[in-house]
Amino acid sequence: MRVKNAVNAKKKRRKILKAVKGYHGALSRRYRLAKQAYIKAKKHAYVGRKLKKRDFRKLWITRINIAARNEGLKYNELIHGLKLAGVAINRKMLSELAVNDPESFKEYVNIAKQAIGK
């Protein structure tokens, strides 16, 4: 007896075609092309999630560096001074302070300056 798989196959195709609904041209209509486009899109999404972390860290460091240089310290001196002083604050919070609360950021800069003896 032959095993028929029409229901599952149709469900699989429908799932892919539903996922690629807004794609351009044949990529949203033809199953074979749609499947390739879907796989590629998922791959790009995965890579993008990894790159996002990198990009945000770069942005935070740039913001901290600009704010620290306005106070007379380089980025690496600021981070080194904060580590010597035992201050546990991450780059995300430090950049938020630099942008939104410059007075608090200035206090952290002073702590770092005292720790490195500047």
From Swiss-Prot:
UniProt-listed InterPro entries: Ribosomal_bL20, RIBOSOMAL_L20_CS, Ribosomal_protein_bL20_C
Cellular component annotations (GO), alphabetically ordered: ribonucleoprotein complex; ribosome
Gene3D superfamilies, per database record: 6.10.160.10, Ribosomal protein L20 (1.10.1900.20)
CDD domains from the UniProt entry: Ribosomal_L20
This protein's record includes keyword Mitochondrion: no
GO molecular function terms attached to this record: rRNA binding; structural constituent of ribosome
Coiled coil (residue ranges): none
Ribosomal protein listed as a keyword: yes
GO biological-process terms attached to the record: ribosomal large subunit assembly; translation
Keywords: Ribonucleoprotein, Ribosomal protein, RNA-binding, rRNA-binding
Transmembrane feature ranges: none
Disulfide bonds: none
Function according to Swiss-Prot or TrEMBL: Binds directly to 23S ribosomal RNA and is necessary for the in vitro assembly process of the 50S ribosomal subunit. It is not involved in the protein synthesizing functions of that subunit.
NCBIfam families reported in the protein's UniProt record: rplT_bact
Family under the similarity heading: Belongs to the bacterial ribosomal protein bL20 family.
The name this protein goes by in its record: Large ribosomal subunit protein bL20
Source organism per UniProt: Thermosipho africanus (strain TCF52B)
Source species taxonomy: Bacteria, Thermotogati, Thermotogota, Thermotogae, Thermotogales
